[in-house]
Amino acid sequence: ETFRIRPSSFFQTNTAQAENMAHMVLRGLFDDFDNHIAAGSISERRPFTVVDAYCGVGTFALLLSRHATKVIAIEESASAIKDARWNLRETENVEILKGKVEDVLPSLTTRLDGLVIDPPRAGCQKSVLDTLIQHPVSRVVYVSCDPSTLARDLDILCHQHPAYRLHSVQPLDMFPHTAHIECVAILEHIEQ
């Protein structure tokens, strides 16, 4: 894939690991993702509405658009939105919403099948976590660049207010020879 990225927009610089991360995200949302690809039905979209929160330049939204009937991308950076619009210009099933995730997500939660959330290093705002607890999503894929804020947010979602079960957490060495890692956590809603 080729993406347009302005200097003020964020993009993973380790593209090999970014590709691994993308596959983890897709596998996390779609249980049958590997079988779907093996069967050659990669172009078949599932009746699935998914949100790409903190979508940046639209990397995950583009990949998700190939597998879900509807993708809603949320981003607050004007620069990133310009890049996302260009990167997603050939998709017909992606809607880009400008705003802060904590402001936009509450109006979407009643119609979501999946959520990809890739917040900044500070993690999710409390209001985002509150929304996920009050209006659970079937499957959440949480991509984090800070294991400590990921642990804090998972504690809230899975223990303090147990709306979700942690299915898995996979670290990725995005920056070899440094202490920085990314993690991909898969959460499943606990039916009450």
Features from the language model and the residues they span:
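Rossmann-like S-adenosyl-L-methionine
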Residues: E1-Q192
